[in-house]
């Protein structure tokens, strides 16, 4: 059968479902009927959501929605980095950094790209200076302008709205899903049906023909998009596509989460996500106006649910008997194929890795971008589906390996969880990257150090998502450094001297921003009209 796709059925709501409805509705320009079928009693997961910088350019700009508009509707705040706390020192779970070598046990994974000097990234000069005893300053504070403004809870935008650094967002996933529901149904003509799928009918070729709901209604379509979450209602249950478990790389499989009130006037609003190391995993903290979302991601092999709840609540001084808690079990891995026949899985029905680097929302719109790029007709050309599947496989596996490196290279060995992470095997590609890093080479160095060009070109960023800046922030932050400085620097005496001016310029920029930027709380009150 040939001819264009006329009908699309999205099964599942939540953030993934409504992002899919909005993105496809915009991309297809009214040439296909889109229906979103959502069970009325399925809760939306997520207690606070953190993102990455290309969300605006790759998703909201594509929809034509200004940043300030959706931010106000979704109680959104800004995120300039991830702050990793206590990933190097042994002890109880606490949001306060312990002492490490005379300073705090924390490091920032900031957005942005490392600057280059004489075609060598600044990271390599920093390590050369550190190796020769010329500096004891941590990598993040030496090479990036952001850490000092993060310490002071400054805004990444001035009160006139101008942007001074790269940033992402924190928001309430429920509010984003609701905002996109209104946008998709009111502006793009997406049909919204609340009903539960009871049966999936496949045709003689193995494709999905229709779904029947609990009320007896039948919905047929040319293309089915599975946004049903961890259930994988269409892709796994109906299409019987196997889910590839990745617990041999990542141990965490559970979470307990909640929201906590916060006194912004007294304490300010933090412009970063916190990732706090715990006995059997780690805890996120996602600040928003008046509260923060938080959750303990842990391994059920090393902590029972009761033990995790107790450790989590003790850290935030919460009563586990009265505090509303969201208890989550999740599968870590990806489908063997994200797209099978006329069924495409998007979001957690396709793949999932713990949110240590805030990739959940990114996985959704990256998959939507690839779906539109490889959009089929009714013949379902296997070349398109195979290419799409390779892109999703690479995206996930690359992120899985980067996340694993956080645990594998943490020097913590004080609990069975941290020791067990050292016994896992790194993927061959990841081991190659580490070997390059230790030999003084850059990993996935972008073609340019211009962050605006990098974040403004989704295709370029997708191909080079975890680059040298990311690896250096995390590996150096964990205390893993190259075996010796880059051999090239021994032949560049003028560059190794003149780079002092570059590091000095970073310090000047830090001082200027610290003196001139408003607090994030002040900026958000102006933006949100509070």
From Swiss-Prot:
Q: Which UniProt keywords apply?
A: FAD, Flavoprotein, Nucleotide-binding, Oxidoreductase
- Transmembrane domains' residue ranges: none
Reactions catalysed according to its record: L-tryptophan + FADH2 + chloride + O2 = 7-chloro-L-tryptophan + FAD + 2 H2O
Q: Could you confirm whether the keyword Mitochondrion appears in this record?
A: no
Its subunit composition reads: Homodimer.
PANTHER family assigned: FAD-BINDING PROTEIN, FLAVIN-DEPENDENT TRYPTOPHAN HALOGENASE
Task: Give the protein name, as stated in the record.
Answer: Tryptophan 7-halogenase RebH
Please give the organism: Lentzea aerocolonigenes
């Amino acid at each position: 059968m040939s001819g264009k796709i006329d009908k699309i059925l999205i099964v599942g709501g939540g953030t993934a479902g409504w992002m899919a409805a909005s993105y496809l509705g915009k991309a297809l320009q009214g040439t296909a009927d889109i229906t979103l079928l959502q069970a009325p009693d399925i809760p939306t997961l997520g207690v606070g959501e953190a993102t990455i910088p290309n969300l605006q350019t790759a998703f909201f700009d594509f929809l034509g929605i200004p940043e300030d508009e959706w931010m106000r509707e979704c109680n959104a705040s800004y995120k300039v980095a991830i702050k990793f706390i206590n990933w190097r020192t042994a002890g109880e779970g606490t949001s306060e950094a312990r002492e490490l070598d005379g300073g705090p046990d924390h490091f920032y994974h900031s957005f942005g790209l490392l600057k280059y000097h004489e075609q060598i990234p600044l990271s390599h000069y920093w390590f050369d200076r550190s190796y020769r005893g010329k500096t004891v300053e941590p990598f993040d504070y030496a090479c990036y302008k952001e850490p000092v403004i993060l310490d002071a809870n400054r805004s990444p935008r001035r009160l006139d709205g101008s942007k001074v650094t790269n940033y992402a967002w924190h928001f309430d996933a429920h509010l984003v899903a609701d905002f996109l529901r209104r946008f998709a149904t009111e502006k793009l003509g997406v049909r919204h049906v609340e009903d539960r799928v009871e049966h999936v009918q496949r045709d003689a070729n193995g494709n999905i023909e229709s779904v029947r709901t609990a009320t007896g209604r039948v919905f047929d379509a040319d293309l089915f998009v599975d946004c049903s979450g961890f259930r994988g209602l269409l892709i796994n249950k109906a299409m019987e596509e196997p889910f590839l478990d990745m617990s041999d790389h990542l141990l965490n499989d559970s979470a307990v989460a909640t929201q906590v009130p916060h006194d912004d006037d007294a304490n300010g609003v933090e412009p970063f996500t916190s990732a706090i190391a715990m006995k059997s995993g780690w805890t996120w903290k996602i600040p928003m106006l008046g509260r923060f979302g938080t959750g303990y991601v842990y391994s059920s092999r090393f902590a029972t649910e009761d033990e995790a709840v107790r450790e989590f609540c003790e850290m935030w001084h919460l009563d586990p008997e009265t505090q509303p808690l969201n208890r989550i079990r999740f599968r870590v891995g990806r489908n063997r194929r994200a797209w099978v026949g006329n069924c495409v899985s998007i979001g957690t029905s396709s793949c999932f890795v713990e949110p240590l680097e805030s990739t959940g929302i990114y996985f959704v719109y990256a998959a939507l971008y690839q779906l539109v790029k490889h959009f089929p007709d009714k013949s379902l050309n296997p070349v398109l589906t195979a290419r799409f599947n390779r892109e999703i496989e690479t995206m996930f596996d690359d992120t899985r390996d980067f996340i694993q490196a956080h645990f594998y290279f943490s020097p913590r060995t004080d609990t069975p969880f941290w020791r067990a992470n050292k016994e896992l095997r790194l993927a061959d590609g990841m081991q190659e990257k580490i070997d390059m890093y230790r030999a003084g080479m850059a990993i996935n160095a972008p073609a340019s150090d211009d962050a605006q060009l990098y974040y403004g070109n989704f295709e370029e960023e997708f191909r080079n998502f975890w680059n040298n800046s990311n690896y250096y922030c995390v590996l150096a932050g964990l205390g893993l450094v190259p075996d010796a400085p880059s051999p090239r620097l021994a032949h560049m005496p003028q560059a190794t001297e003149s780079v002092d001016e570059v590091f000095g310029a970073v310090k000047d920029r830090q001082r200027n921003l610290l003196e001139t930027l408003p607090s994030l709380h002040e900026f958000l009150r102006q933006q949100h009209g509070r």
